[in-house]
């Protein structure tokens, strides 16, 4: 934003362009609440500002600035922008972009008189309705060369940008100033022209004035002056605008190579000439009328014979006559000076004023009706005299021409009477035509004057066209104007929204297409397309009796109810009648069609036009010189034909001319780079500063302002080609682009932009250009300017440094020279007083004196010579100087001449170019005329020559007839031969019919078998569905009843039995397919037999074709002769027509003579006699002409007779043949060969032969088609059967399809190989896992001390498991790829088959239509037969190879089965080991139960513990409720997921440690049993020692109690922390359980869908494989492999589960072993005090034992559940289920351990109390117990660490399983789509089979029909023979006649 100092250059315009700094600071500091400040929708003012008071249930209460309170919906409020965006210059920069924000920004700027605002890529201007100082010269200078962002918004900124774009981009520009009428378009257009005329002056005005003598001003002045002149004659006051342009103009300002003005031209569109004679009440006519009557120039009033009162002239005073905002007197002076500046001559200027005055007088001409007649006559001649005087006419002639016009009726001219209304309309039409032509002539003269002939390179076009108009009365002019605005708006929309986004797509930029809903095509097409409004209007204008009513009816019939934009208007009282309504983009407009036909035809009184052409006012004569009247046309004499043509071409309706000009305009605009200025009308009352919200909003919506801002903000409005960008902006970082090596412009641009410090999201790279967001290019330009400034500064510094160094070097050299001189002078000064040196000085000159004397003498001589030479040279020099002066003068003169000649040469070159163009056009016309003349001469010569040749040709025809007789004899022989062939063919067809019947039976049988297989497959699918349902039920039973492992095995066996049953059904289906293949082989053998028979037929057909070709050649020769004779007849007809034209010319001349006689005066008797004589002469000439025509007809008749004698006198036979020819021509090209029957009977014979050949071919085609249809039906079962019944061309195509199917076989085999590889990989992985299991089991049995080693092996096993999962997912993805590829290939094959079917149908039709195609097809059949045989052999080889491959695969399958059996055996062994370990676990459980009975005595002491346990259970129930509530906070827990996972790991580790401690307690119980006996024996001995140790124990106990108290406090704190963590973790675990359950369900469903689709896929694959030989076994084996792989995978998962269980038990056992060893040592160190605490400990142990048994039982149940889930669910679901079970088990263990910790703490408390009582021994026992607990804590910590590791592994596994689930889901969907497509194909094949049956029936009917036609052809051949005999007789008679005549 510029400062106030920078804005000072704009002078007094600064406050009208940009806010001051003070206002900006105040706006930024103004208080603003972004949450409550809003715009709210309000009915009266559309939107008002307000603040939100409250919100309630979708309703918002807003208090407006006016104090009103509104309650609206939330979608009716819009957020307000911060204050810093108030009066923003570019609305695209606003934070909140919506309608109220744009409206209020415009309103606030308009209130501050800032009328220009940017809106993205274009400028919006609001009409101020007052003068503002924003167009002053200092403003023009301030905007010159400024970038858009550097200066405030202004029309000058748009203009300067267009100018700069033209110079930099070297592309034509255009500025489209659009908007509604009264929005300020004309003013902005003038300002644009003013700007260009100011900044781009030519600079050489003197030269310009010298080169163009007529010019009164410079080019700049002329361009500016064109506007006042055009406005005076083309602008008028309307309801909405005081200075409305009533015509459109497109001003092109041309610039030279340097950017200076070169020339200009103006194109105008659609002047509203109806305004000349009619205005509405609130409007007035064109300004010129009122300027003239303003009396500013009284000489005009006198010259034009008018008054100063406009009301004296009805044409210009029907509305208002004055406008407050226009000074007509000043405008008249401006118009007058503009005429002078634009170079109009004085005569032309006077003519303009005179014709304008004549138009005014025309409105005063009055006519009245004659008495008792309808004829009009003048009502006074005074006005007519004035008008005629001003037009240079005779008033009497003018009145006569108006009242009695001459009209052409036929070939005569008649004087027509006119009514008063007709004369008045004619006067108005003449006035409008004269004014329009004068306006267009003025534009042409302006263009001539503005054309300076200077070289022009580019132009900037400024479009100012009438805005959208909605008046009370809308006529044809309004429709044209509104249609133009529709086109311009569509251009704007297309350029701004569609082209912009299409270029993004074309350039490859990521862009989502935005439909802004701005397509106006419907309304445009309604107006301009065929059968649109303009089309119907022009059509009605062509009909003489058309009326407005008929036009309206046609419009209603064509569009009412059919087009949404065309409506019937409602009748409103007080408004003008409307006939139809159109919905335009700016609103609905009612149109009145009254007088549209006349307006469109624009009829003129031709008699008056003829007077105009003879006017003494040269301008008027010139205006109408191009009009070709009927009389002038008639008087053109010999050029009548040319004149008629010119009149026909000149008749063009107004609408057609308008559309032509509009299309040219749109073409010009599309070739330029457009800049849009959208003018807005603020109010209807023309009040300055007032703005009507709804009116402005309507214009914003219609003009696309909001959409333009959006596309500017979202899109990339600036773009540069890569090469241009690299060249222009390389300076920003030259190092980014390496020098000396080639680099692509795109890569260079990418590197350059990447190295610059800018926002890299603000640009995108396209294919050819780099695209920038709005504003970024300006930033780059600023950076470039700064960089250039730096570079130039650096260059200047380097240059200055170089110059300084050069100067310094010179100084150094001068210094050295000075030192040398000083040295020499000092040396001289030292020796000059030395005596010897003085002697040297004296003697040395004397030594050289003699020599010097000689030299002096020679020098004197040379001096004398040089003196003489100097005198001579001086004389010569003076002469040369004189010559030089003269030559310089001549040179200057020559330069001036050369300059003038160069300019003349440029003009001459342009003229030469124009002359060359005209010469080329004239040469083309001359060439056409000469060619026509030559053609006429050739035709005449040919006629004479052909007349002479007719007799010769008659004799030749006789010879031909003799030849035909000979050929006829041959043809008869051939006919007998063909009859025999036809009989043979009919016999063969009978055989073929039998084979067809057999084939149909076989087809039905195959269809039944196919249907049976489909039914079987459906039954299998039903079984699979029932099985899946049963499986689901079983899964539910597993979840509900927790069945045992034996039940799962039973279910598995049931499933395997079902699978075996399905496999057996599949084998049965495969056996049926083998039977079908055997039948196919039999059909192949039959096909070979048929092919052999067809080859024999082909050889016969080829022989007949050779004969047929010879006959056709002869027929064509005869036909050519007949055509020549017909051409001669046509030539005679042409000569006759020429004679008739000459007769019409003579009649025209006679009529003209009679008319001239009538015009010369009255009809005297002498003249009547002369007329009679001339009529007699005319009759005589007519008779002569008729005789001549009769002679021509006689000659033509003689020619026809001769032709009939030679050929056509063949009589009835030729007539019959001609009728046959006509009939055959109507049947298009079906029987094309029968046309030759016109020549001779030979053609009939050849036609019969052709019919026979056609029958043969059609029969063959029918057979082939039946076979092809049969093959299509059988393709579902076996695609190879498609070769049956086809001819060799069709069989070739289907053999290619067979190749494709074989390719599919190879693909499937490759897929099978891929599957086998996958299976082998699975085997290897299974072997590795089994080895790992064996190693682990061996390690478990051998030693429990290798825990760490086994743990590492377990981790490796998990990694291998993950690898297996990845490999399996990869294999599944490959399978999916193969399936998709197979699917696409299958679809392509079916599409190709359907295309082949269509091609076959086309070929059948072509064979029926073109019998000649038999020759080529017969030749191709032999080739295709050989190729087919080769392909069949290749196919047999391929089949053998596939069979061998199948055998190899069988061997591999058997080996794989053996391997699987071995794995099963190993699995059973491991399972047995697992069961043994479980039995051991049960035995341990029983021992624990026994121990529990032994410790029942301590139950009394545990009652207190039980109460506390109940309290804890209550707390646990509360915690479970909290866990349920925690499931609702899933999204919150996800945020702290990382922390929770860490805590979960710690907690799970603690749970595992607790579990280990429980297991440790079990081992402890066993040890205690052993120790009890020893303890009993020692108790008696230690009782005596008890009393002695009590005192010591008390002291020790006090210390222990204190330490225990501290430890208990720490334990309480840790317990509280653990409880808190537990609550969090329980919520997390519950959430994870829900997620796991959900994923389990999803996985189960996906698995069920997967299995269903797998079953369907197998069935469909089996159906598809039926079409491929030998593929059934492959499919079956593939299915078996997949099932076995699934079983193996399930078994692997079971083994993994059991392995994990054994691993867990192994770990527990190891931990127990360690604990046991520690406890043994501790027990040995314990004292006898354990006897008293033994019972308490035994009760604790018994309680723990019971809880442990429950835990073990729960673990067993969980294991059984996990096994069931593993067997029934898929691989992924099993893993997830296992994780869920383990997490539940850990949760239960955690709870139990918490309980045990509490119990232990209670026991500790009790132990303390007992210790106080029991003494020293009890204290020792408690201390030992404390140590035990500390050891347990340490072991728990170790287990915690191990659990963390395990938990992380499980988490990784869960992620892998979720990924695998997603892949399986995608595969299932893909398979489902494939199944749907294959089912659709099966249905289409069924439908095709039915169609084939129908086609076979139709072919049989066609065959019978052809047989019938063959019989008819034989009858016609017999008839032809009899006709030939008749022709022979007639030819002999003709011959005898000719001989007798000669």
UniProtKB/Swiss-Prot annotation:
The modification Phosphothreonine is found at residues 64, 69, 419, 1244, 1258, 1289, 1470, 1504, 1520, 1733, 1739. It comes from the Eukaryota. The modification Phosphoserine is found at residues 625, 1095, 1099, 1165, 1240, 1246, 1264, 1291, 1295, 1306, 1309, 1477, 1498, 1517, 1557, 1577, 1603, 1606, 1717, 1729, 1742. One of its GO terms (molecular function) is actin filament binding. Expressed in type 2a myofibers in the tibialis anterior and soleus muscles (at protein level). It holds the Pfam family Myosin_tail_1. Residues 662-684 are annotated as: Actin-binding. Residues 1130-1175 are annotated as: Disordered. ATP binds at residues 179-186. InterPro entries: IQ_motif_EF-hand-BS, Kinesin_motor_dom_sf, Myosin_head_motor_dom-like, Myosin_N, Myosin_S1_N, Myosin_tail, P-loop_NTPase, XRCC4-like_C. Residues 1131-1159 have a biased composition (Basic and acidic residues). Residues 86-785 form the Myosin motor domain. One of its GO terms (biological process) is response to muscle activity. GO terms for cellular component: A band; actomyosin contractile ring; cell-cell junction; muscle myosin complex; myofibril; myosin filament. The keyword Lipid metabolism does not apply. Residues 788-817 form the IQ domain. Belongs to the TRAFAC class myosin-kinesin ATPase superfamily. Myosin family. This is Myosin-2. It comes from Mus musculus. The lineage of its organism: Eukaryota, Metazoa, Chordata, Craniata, Vertebrata.
């Amino acid at each position: 934003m510029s400062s106030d100092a920078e804005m000072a250059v704009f002078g007094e315009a600064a406050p009208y362009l940009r806010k001051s700094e003070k206002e900006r600071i105040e706006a930024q500091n103004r208080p603003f609440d972004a949450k409550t400040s809003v715009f709210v929708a309000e009915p009266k003012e559309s939107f008002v500002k307000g603040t939100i008071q409250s919100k309630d249930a979708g309703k918002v209460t807003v208090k407006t600035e006016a104090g009103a309170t509104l309650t609206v919906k939330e979608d009716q409020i819009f957020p307000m922008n911060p204050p810093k965006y108030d009066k923003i210059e570019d609305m695209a920069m606003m934070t909140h972009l919506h309608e109220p924000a744009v409206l209020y920004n415009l309103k606030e700027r308009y209130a501050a008189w800032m009328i220009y605002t940017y809106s993205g890529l274009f400028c919006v201007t609001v009409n101020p309705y007052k003068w503002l100082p924003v167009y002053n010269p200092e403003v023009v200078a301030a905007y010159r060369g400024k970038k858009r962002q550097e200066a405030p918004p202004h029309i000058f900124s748009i203009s300067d940008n267009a100018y700069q774009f033209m110079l930099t981009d070297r592309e034509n520009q255009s500025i489209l100033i659009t908007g509604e009428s009264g929005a300020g378009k004309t003013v902005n257009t003038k300002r644009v022209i003013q700007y260009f005329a100011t900044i781009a002056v030519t600079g050489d005005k003197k030269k310009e004035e010298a080169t163009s003598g007529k010019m009164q001003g410079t080019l700049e002045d002329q361009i500016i002056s064109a506007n006042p002149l055009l406005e005076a004659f083309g602008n008028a006051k309307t309801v909405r605008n005081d200075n409305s342009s009533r015509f459109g103009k497109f001003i092109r300002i041309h610039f030279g190579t340097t950017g200076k003005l070169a020339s200009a031209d103006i194109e105008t569109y659609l002047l509203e000439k109806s305004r000349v004679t009619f205005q509405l009440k609130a409007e007035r006519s064109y300004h010129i009328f009122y300027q003239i009557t303003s009396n500013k120039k009284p000489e005009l009033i006198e010259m034009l014979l008018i008054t100063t009162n406009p009301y004296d002239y009805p044409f210009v005073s029907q509305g208002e006559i004055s406008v407050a905002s226009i000074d007509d007197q000043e405008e008249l002076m401006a118009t007058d000076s503009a005429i002078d500046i634009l170079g109009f001559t004085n005569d032309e200027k006077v003519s303009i004023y005179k014709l304008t005055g004549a138009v005014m007088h025309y409105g005063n001409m009055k006519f009245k009706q004659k008495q008792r007649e309808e004829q009009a006559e003048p009502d006074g001649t005074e006005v007519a005299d004035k008008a005629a005087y001003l037009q240079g006419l005779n008033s009497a002639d003018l009145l006569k021409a108006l009242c009695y016009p001459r009209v052409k009726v036929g070939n005569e001219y008649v004087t027509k009477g006119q009514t008063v209304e007709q004369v008045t309309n004619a006067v108005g039409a003449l006035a409008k035509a004269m004014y329009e032509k004068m306006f267009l002539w003025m534009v042409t003269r302006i263009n001539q004057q503005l054309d300076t002939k200077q070289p022009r390179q580019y132009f900037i076009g400024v479009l100012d066209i009438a805005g959208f108009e909605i008046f009370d009365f809308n006529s044809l002019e309004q429709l044209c104007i509104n249609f133009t605005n529709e086109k311009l708006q569509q251009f704007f929309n297309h350029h701004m929204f569609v082209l912009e986004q299409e270029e993004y797509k074309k350039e490859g930029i990521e862009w989502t297409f935005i439909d802004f809903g701005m397509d106006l095509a419907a309304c445009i097409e309604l107006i301009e397309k065929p059968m649109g409004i303009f089309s119907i209007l022009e059509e009605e204008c062509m009909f003489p009796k058309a009326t407005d009513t008929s036009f309206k009816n046609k419009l209603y019939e064509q569009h009412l109810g059919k087009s949404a934009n065309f409506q019937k208007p409602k009748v409103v009282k007080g408004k003008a009648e409307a006939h139809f309504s159109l919905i335009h983009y700016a609103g609905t407009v009612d149109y009145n069609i009254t007088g549209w036909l006349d307006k469109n035809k624009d009829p003129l009184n031709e008699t008056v036009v003829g007077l105009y052409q003879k006017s003494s006012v040269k301008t008027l004569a010139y205006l109408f010189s191009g009009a070709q009247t009927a009389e002038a046309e008639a008087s053109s004499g010999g050029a009548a034909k040319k004149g008629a043509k010119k009149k026909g071409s000149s008749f063009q309706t107004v609408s057609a001319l308008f559309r032509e000009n509009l299309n040219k305009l749109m073409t010009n605009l599309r070739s330029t780079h457009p800049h849009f200025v959208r003018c807005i009308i603020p109010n209807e009352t023309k009040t300055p500063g007032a703005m009507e919200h709804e009116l402005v909003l309507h214009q914003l919506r219609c003009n696309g302002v909001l959409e333009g801002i959006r596309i500017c903000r979202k899109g990339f409005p600036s773009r540069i080609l890569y090469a241009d960008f690299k060249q222009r902006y390389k300076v920003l970082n030259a190092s980014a682009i390496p020098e000396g090596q080639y680099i692509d412009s795109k890569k260079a641009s990418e590197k350059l932009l990447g190295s610059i410090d800018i926002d890299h999201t603000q640009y995108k790279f396209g294919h050819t250009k780099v695209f920038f967001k709005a504003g970024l290019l300006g930033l780059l330009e600023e950076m470039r300017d700064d960089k250039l400034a730096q570079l130039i500064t650096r260059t200047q510094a380097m240059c200055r440094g170089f110059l300084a160094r050069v100067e310094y070097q010179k100084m150094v050299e001068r210094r050295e020279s000075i030192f040398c001189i000083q040295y020499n002078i000092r040396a001289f000064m030292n020796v000059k007083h030395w005596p010897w040196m003085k002697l040297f000085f004296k003697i040395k000159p004397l030594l050289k004196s003699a020599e010097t004397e000689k030299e002096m003498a020679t020098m004197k001589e040379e001096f004398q010579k040089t003196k003489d030479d100097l005198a001579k040279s001086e004389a010569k020099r003076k002469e040369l100087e004189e010559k030089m002066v003269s030559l310089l003068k001549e040179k200057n003169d020559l330069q001036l001449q050369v300059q003038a000649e160069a300019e003349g040469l440029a003009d001459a070159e342009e003229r030469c170019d124009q002359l060359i163009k005209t010469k080329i056009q004239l040469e083309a016309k001359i060439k056409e005329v000469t060619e026509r003349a030559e053609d006429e001469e050739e035709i005449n010569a040919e006629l004479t020559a052909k007349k002479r040749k007719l007799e010769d040709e008659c004799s030749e025809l006789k010879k031909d007839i003799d030849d035909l007789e000979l050929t006829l004899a041959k043809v008869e022989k051939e006919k007998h031969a063909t009859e025999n062939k036809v009989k043979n063919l009919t016999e063969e067809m009978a055989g073929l019919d039998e084979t067809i019947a057999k084939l149909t039976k076989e087809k039905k049988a195959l269809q039944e078998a196919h249907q049976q297989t489909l039914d079987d497959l459906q039954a299998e699918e039903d079984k699979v569905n029932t099985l899946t349902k049963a499986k689901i039920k079983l899964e539910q039973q597993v979840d509900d009843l927790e069945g045992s492992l034996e039940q799962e095995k039973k279910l598995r066996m049931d499933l395997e039995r079902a699978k075996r049953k399905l496999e057996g059904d599949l084998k049965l289906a495969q056996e049926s397919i083998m039977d079908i293949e055997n039948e196919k082989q039999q059909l192949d053998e039959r096909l070979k037999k048929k092919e052999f028979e067809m080859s024999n037929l082909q050889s016969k057909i080829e022989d007949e074709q050779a004969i047929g070709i010879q006959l056709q050649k002869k027929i064509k020769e005869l036909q050519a002769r007949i055509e020549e004779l017909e051409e001669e007849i046509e030539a005679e007809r042409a000569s006759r027509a020429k004679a008739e034209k000459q007769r019409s010319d003579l009649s025209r001349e006679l009529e003209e003579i009679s008319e001239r006689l009538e015009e010369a005066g009255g009809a005297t008797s002498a003249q009547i006699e002369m007329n009679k004589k001339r009529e007699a002469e005319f009759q005589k000439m007519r008779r002569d002409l008729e005789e001549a025509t009769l002679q021509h007809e006689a000659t033509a008749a003689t020619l026809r007779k001769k032709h009939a004698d030679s050929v056509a006198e063949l009589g009835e036979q030729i007539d019959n043949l001609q009728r046959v020819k006509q009939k055959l021509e109507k049947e298009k090209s079906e029987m094309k060969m029968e046309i030759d029957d016109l020549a001779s009977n030979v053609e009939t014979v050849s036609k019969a032969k052709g019919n026979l050949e056609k029958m043969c071919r059609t029969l063959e085609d029918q057979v082939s088609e039946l076979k092809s249809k049969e093959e299509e039906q059988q393709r579902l079962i076996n695609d190879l059967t498609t070769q049956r019944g086809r001819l060799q061309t069709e069989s070739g195509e289907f053999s290619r399809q067979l190749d494709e199917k074989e390719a599919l076989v190879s693909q499937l085999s490759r897929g099978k190989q891929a599957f086998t590889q996958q299976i082998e990989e699975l085997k290897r992985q299974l072997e590795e896992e089994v080895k790992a299991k064996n190693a682990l089991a061996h390690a478990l049995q051998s030693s429990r001390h290798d825990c760490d080693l086994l743990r590492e092996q377990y981790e490796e096993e998990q990694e291998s498991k993950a690898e297996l999962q990845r490999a399996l997912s990869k294999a599944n993805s490959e399978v999916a790829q193969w399936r998709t590829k197979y699917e696409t290939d299958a679809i392509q094959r079916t599409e190709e088959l359907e295309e082949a079917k269509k091609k076959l149908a086309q070929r059948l039709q072509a064979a029926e239509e073109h019998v000649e195609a038999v020759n080529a097809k017969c030749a191709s059949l032999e080739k295709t037969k050989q190729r087919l045989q080769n392909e069949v052999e290749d196919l047999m080889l391929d089949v053998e190879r596939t069979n061998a491959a199948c055998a190899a695969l069988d061997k591999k399958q058997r080996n794989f089965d053996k391997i699987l059996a071995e794995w099963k055996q190993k699995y059973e062994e491991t399972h047995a080991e697992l069961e043994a370990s479980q039995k051991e676990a049960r035995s341990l459980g029983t021992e624990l139960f026994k121990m529990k009975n032994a410790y029942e005595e301590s139950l009394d002491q545990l009652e207190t513990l039980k109460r506390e346990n109940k309290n804890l259970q209550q707390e646990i129930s509360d915690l479970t409720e909290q866990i349920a509530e925690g499931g609702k906070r899933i999204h919150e827990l996800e945020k702290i997921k990382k922390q929770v996972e860490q805590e979960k790991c710690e907690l799970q580790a603690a749970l595992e440690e607790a579990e280990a401690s429980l297991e440790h307690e079990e081992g402890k119980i066993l040890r205690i049993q052993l120790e009890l006996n020893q303890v009993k024996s020692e108790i008696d001995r230690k009782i005596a020692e008890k009393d002695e140790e009590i005192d010591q124990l008390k002291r020790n106990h006090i210390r222990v109690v204190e330490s225990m108290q501290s430890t208990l406090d720490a334990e309480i704190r840790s317990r509280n922390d653990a409880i808190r963590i537990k609550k969090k973790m329980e919520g997390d675990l519950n959430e994870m359980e829900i997620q796991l359950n959900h994923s389990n369900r999803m996985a189960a469903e996906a698995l069920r869908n997967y299995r269903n689709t797998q079953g369907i896929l197998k069935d469909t694959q089996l159906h598809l494989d039926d079409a491929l030989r030998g593929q059934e076994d492959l499919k079956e084996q593939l299915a078996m492999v997949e099932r076995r792989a699934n079983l193996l995978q399930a078994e692997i998962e079971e083994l993994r589960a059991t392995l994990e269980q054994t691993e867990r038990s192994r770990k527990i056992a190891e931990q127990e072993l360690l604990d046991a060893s520690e406890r043994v040592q501790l027990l040995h160190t314990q004292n006898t005090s354990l006897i008293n605490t033994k019972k308490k400990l035994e009760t604790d142990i018994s309680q723990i034992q019971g809880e442990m048994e429950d835990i073990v039982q729960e673990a067993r149940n969980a294991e059984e559940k996990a096994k069931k889930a593993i067997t029934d669910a898929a691989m992924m679901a099993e893993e997830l289920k296992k994780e869920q079970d383990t997490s539940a088990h850990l949760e239960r263990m955690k709870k139990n351990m918490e309980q045990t910790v509490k119990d232990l703490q209670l026991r500790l408390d009790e132990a303390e109390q007992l210790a106080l009582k029991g003494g020293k021994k009890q204290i020792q026992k408690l201390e030992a117990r404390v140590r035990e607990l500390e050891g347990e804590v340490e072991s728990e910590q170790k287990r915690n660490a191990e659990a963390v590791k395990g938990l992380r592994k499980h988490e990784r596994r869960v992620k892998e399983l979720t990924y695998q689930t997603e892949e399986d889901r995608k595969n299932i969907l893909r398979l489902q789509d494939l199944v749907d497509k294959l089912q659709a194909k099966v249905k289409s094949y069924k439908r095709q089979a039915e169609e084939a049956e129908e086609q076979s029936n139709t072919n049989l009917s066609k065959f019978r029909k052809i047989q019938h036609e063959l019989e008819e052809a034989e009858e016609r051949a017999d008839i032809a023979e009899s006709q030939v005999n008749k022709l022979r007789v007639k030819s002999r008679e003709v011959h005898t006649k000719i001989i007798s005549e000669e």
